[in-house]
Amino acid sequence: MTQKEFNFSIYNTKFYGQYWQAKETSAVIVLAHGMGEHSNRYQHVAKKLTEHNFSAVAFDHFGHGKTEGKRGHNPSFEAVLESISKVIEKAKEFFPNKPLFLYGHSMGGNAVINYTIRKNHQLAGTIATSPFLKLAFKPPAIKLFVGKMLQNIVPSLTMGNELDVQAISREKEEVKKYIEDPLVHAKISPN
């Protein structure tokens, strides 16, 4: 397995990306991470994929990991979908004429499902694990009202995402790594 880094820019933001190349690539999987995470947290997934002749391409979303920007903020959901388009372009550049799959987890799962529905560019398939399709709880009406107001007034305002870190995995070591990872954050913006 060979690992390489790359960058691209959209919305005046420099994105960090990386890819893992299998010895013989049969297909490519573009990975979209979850809220507060970054692409490096999926190295173990990339390793397993390359062992089965799948190369993997991943990137850090707006305001995540090594990508520039305020932690937890993105300009818009459309901008998130455009960033996925850019990574797909990069994947096609690195691995021409190979079948391409999208894989997303949690927030990334929501993004890849929406991308597939709205912009499917000849994808071989889409995989989503624990996709964020709706909130796990119903927030108070006042919180929803204030959130919608803030989205129009101060869209880049970030606040805690209220994620229960203990619930991200049943493996205590995985939870510990998540908590201790300096590139993981617990921020979210109204956008």
Where are these regions (language model features)?
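Alpha/beta-hydrolase-fold enzymes
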Residues: 107-189
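N-terminal cap/lid segment of alpha/beta-hydrolase-fold proteins
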Residues: 1-24
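Conserved alpha/beta-hydrolase
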Residues: 41, 46-70
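Catalytic nucleophile-loop/oxyanion-hole region of alpha/beta-hydrolase
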Residues: 36-39, 65-95, 99
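The conserved beta1-alpha1 loop
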Residues: 30-34, 105
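Active-site glycine-rich loops that stabilize anionic/oxyanionic intermediates
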Residues: 26, 34-37
